[in-house]
Design a protein with these regions (language model features):
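Cleavable N-terminal export/targeting peptides
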Residues: 1-33
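Gram-negative (and chloroplast) outer-membrane scaffold detector with strong preference
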Residues: 24-30, 85-168, 174-176, 188-190
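Transmembrane beta-barrel strands of outer-membrane/channel proteins
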Residues: 39-47, 98-102, 154-160, 183, ...
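Outer-membrane beta-barrel "beta-signal"
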Residues: 38, 136-137, 216-229
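Short glycine/proline- and aromatic-enriched beta-strand/turn motifs that initiate or cap beta-hairpins
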Residues: 22-88, 222
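Residue-level signature of outer-membrane beta-barrel architecture
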Residues: 45, 88, 138-140, 183-187, ...
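Flexible, surface-exposed loop regions and adjacent strand-edge segments
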Residues: 55-62, 112-119, 170-174, 212-218
Length: 229
């Protein structure tokens, strides 16, 4: 929770920067309109999580008698990565977009409590994390600031999760759902222009290399550059 709070504070700080710089960089012009396309890309981060412990047991002659062989504890490091998206404006307030995320978190498995008193050992491997996503966005034009150049938005959608590990020999798949809030800060004027894009929110993942069948909620933040055309 402490990591989530730090990420939230960082996101709020980032959101305030465009308002401070607005007078220097905005030169006017209309906001995105129906038929506009928006291409975006940049970096992202989600914190790691603990996947819990599993004890390997040996069943003896009767089902009620078990013998603990060892215990394994698994955890995943943070998810620093990159994203790309392409969106289409259905109207001035509504757009849809498809995108792709890529990250390489580290999966750590610690073996302890060996029945034969072997020393504890930790094995690390890097996982290739791919996410193909689709979202719908509601652009809050009435809440724009910085002379209209900064337009907040809400976003929600789902994705297909694909994760490779064991030297990319094993493939795990799953689902992802997200609810985000962000801001587009457009630079200059005209139908073709660049902008800055920041957003944060919650991502719920299911399966992948995570053995838990329930949804796992994680905070996530994004920051990057957009191009309107």
């Amino acid at each position: 929770m402490r990591n989530a709070a730090q990420l939230f504070l960082m996101f709020i700080t980032i959101l305030t920067l465009p308002a401070i710089a607005g007078a220097q960089v905005y030169a006017g012009g209309d906001a995105p309109r129906r038929g506009s396309f928006e291409a975006a890309g940049g970096g992202m981060f989600a914190p790691g999580f603990d996947m819990g412990s599993v004890t390997a047991e040996l069943t003896r002659s009767t089902p009620t008698e078990t013998f603990d062989l060892f215990t394994s504890d698994s955890e995943v490091s943070g998810f620093p990565g990159a994203f790309v998206r392409l969106g289409y404006y259905l109207s001035e307030s509504v757009s849809v977009e498809g995108g792709f995320r890529y990250a390489r978190p580290t999966l750590s498995v610690r073996l302890s409590g060996d029945a034969e008193s072997a020393p504890d050992v930790t094995a690390d491997e890097t996982v290739s994390h791919y996410l193909f996503e689709g979202s719908a966005l509601w652009h809050l034009r009435d809440l724009s600031f910085a002379s209209g150049s900064a337009i907040p938005y809400l976003s929600g959608g789902a994705g297909y999760l694909r994760e490779l590990h064991e030297g990319n020999q094993l493939v795990e798949t799953g689902q992802e759902y997200h609810a985000l809030a962000g801001v587009n800060f457009w630079l200059g004027s005209g139908q073709h222009r660049f902008g800055l894009r920041f957003e944060g929110g919650m991502s719920a993942r299911k399966k992948g290399f995570d053995p838990d069948d329930s949804l796992r909620m994680l905070p996530v933040v994004f920051g990057g550059v957009s191009y309107l055309f």
